[in-house]
Amino acid sequence: MDIEEIKRQKMMELQQQQAQGAPNPEEIQQQQEQERAAYEAQKKQIMKKILSEEARHRLSNIKMVKPEFAEQVEMQLIQLAQSGRLPIPVSDEYFKTLLDQLYTMGSAKKKRDIKFVRK
């Protein structure tokens, strides 16, 4: 799909919603909250199957300190588990190596060099 096709499809959806009487913003927000809660519950269930108890505890600690990084780790774990490239359950030691790899990949992108030019 190209961008123009997506725009046309979105425009048609909006026109259909207006013709049917669009739901009010509270209903939309409530529906989004329900979807988000269902998504989080499903993700938690998958993490329970994938990770050992110690690894889950480590992930919850990371989630408190760096929620964005924890989200990235969870997505990576789910993808690896679905592709069958992950030993289930993931031990804490294996989880540490995965975290180290993910962290070094992420920090390599963000690393900046500051140079002082003196005259």
UniProtKB/Swiss-Prot annotation:
Region labeled Disordered — which residues?
A: 1-36
Name the Pfam families on file: dsDNA_bind
Q: Name one GO cellular component term.
A: cytosol
Q: Which domain of life is it from?
A: Archaea
Spell out the Low complexity composition-biased ranges: 15-32
Keywords attached to this Swiss-Prot or TrEMBL record, sorted alphabetically, are: DNA-binding
- Record field: compositional bias (Basic and acidic residues): 1-11
GO MF entries: DNA binding
- InterPro entries recorded for this chain? DNA_bind_arc, PDCD5-like, PDCD5-like_sf
Q: Which family does it belong to?
A: Belongs to the PDCD5 family.
This protein is called what?
Answer: DNA-binding protein Maeo_0998
Source organism (scientific name): Methanococcus aeolicus (strain ATCC BAA-1280 / DSM 17508 / OCM 812 / Nankai-3)
